Structure formats: structure tokens, C-alpha cells
Amino acid sequence: MPTINQLVRKSRKTVKAQSDSPALKNCPQRRGVCTVVKTTTPKKPNSALRKIARVRLTNGYEVSAYIPGVGHNLQEHSVVLIRGGRVKDLPGVRYHIVRGALDSAGVATRMQSRSKYGAKKPKQK
């Protein structure tokens, strides 16, 4: 506990909130180029092969981004759009790739939550 004199000499510092997605630099999305596309396994209670991509952003950062949905067409040198949003069971993956934007195709067979996966409305018969 500081004394009054100590507080007069040097006041308390306010704690600044840290960003959950620092590589975006306060932008809603960023464009980047895939350097590696691979699969990883999640943390302990879960088991799967999660698809991720290492992306070099236009501002020079290189981040890991999750590829949501079933199936994808991404490979090295694909240009993608990333947004914030971590994947809870993949340590170090703090970004999501936006499906249906730039080189990333939408999920073809998606019927529900289509806007989140860049899927077009199916033709009515």
C-alpha cells in the first residue's frame, strides 16, 4: 500500500486492455497470402484434424488462421481475407478465414447459416 507522498510523486498507472487480435491493427478484416495450409490436432479432450493456414498479412504480420466449414480450396499463395476470432481448442490460432471472399470459395453444400460460410442461396424447384 503506497503512502500519500508516494502517490503524489508518482500516480497510479491505468491498465490498458490488450487486443484479442493484435495483427488486425484495429481493422475489421485484413488481406493476406497463405504460406502454409495444413491440419493440426486440438487440445486434450477433443480429437480431430482441424484445417489451418499460416497467412502473411499485408501489414507484415504472419498469423495462423482457422479455415471453417467442410472442405476448402485453399493452397499456398491463395489470397484470403481474415477476421478476428479464436479457436478455443487450437492454441495460437486467433483468427478465422472469411469463406466466400477473395480466393476462398464458399461451402458448397451449406443450407443453414449460409452467410457465415459464403454459400449462395440454392435454386428453388
Swiss-Prot record:
Keywords: Methylation, Ribonucleoprotein, Ribosomal protein, RNA-binding, rRNA-binding, tRNA-binding. Residues 1-26 are annotated as: Disordered. The modification 3-methylthioaspartic acid is found at D89. One of its GO terms (biological process) is translation. The keyword Transmembrane helix does not apply. One of its GO terms (molecular function) is rRNA binding. One of its GO terms (cellular component) is small ribosomal subunit. HAMAP family: Ribosomal_uS12_B. Part of the 30S ribosomal subunit. Contacts proteins S8 and S17. May interact with IF1 in the 30S initiation complex. With S4 and S5 plays an important role in translational accuracy. Belongs to the universal ribosomal protein uS12 family. This is Small ribosomal subunit protein uS12. It comes from Clostridium tetani (strain Massachusetts / E88).
